[in-house]
């Protein structure tokens, strides 16, 4: 007689059950978040859990040998489909599909789970919820960004934080791209450089972690190695010096290339607009 198999009551690595008080609190916070999204004029959007893999894009992964390694993908006939990695890729696909039916300025919010095939860690899960608010279309960038900062401020206050408990850091990608162009960093290395800079404020990184990723490689506490951009010493120094600058006037003097200056001007316009909103004391 075949032995009866016993059920192993466990979860896959990187996933968790959410229940009781923790789930009740989550639902309360989501209600505040959604109410603010609606107050700021956004319409809800739900997209399927799966997208066609080629629409997700190989830019998501850092491993050139296996560019889709950070996502969960499956074969569906002659196509590959991927579990939703974020809420931005589905939005881009939706707008491209429905562009003719959308208003010239389209505000949408989405609150859905996303899935990452990444190494789990403390507080780092393979399935988690994102809440996105986006403004798409013909609008003034400074006003749109100020509106988003006011939305963030109002939402966090309604969720129970006070103004002393959070700040909103802003930047402009044109400033970074201008520096990258100025340093003659090759195109195949640029994405790694941008990803390294984006990790500056991430716990456990700081300037030391960014420096390692700008060089040959970074080894984390577990011993896992991430391949770096392999820049030369002067390029690394210039980027680290740039990251230490906190004053917009100093930045304007240091980066004289046209693209960076354009990004700095957009930031200046933003700070003029934000002075009239609820977020003026929260933004830096």
What annotation goes with each model-predicted range?
Residues 56-59, 120-123, 178-183:
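Short acidic, glycine/serine/threonine-rich loops at helix termini
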Residues 2-3, 25-41, 51-52, 78, ...:
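Positively charged, Gly/Ser-enriched RNA/tRNA-binding surfaces
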Residues 153-157, 174-182:
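Hydrophobic mid-domain F-helix/FG-region of cytochrome P450s
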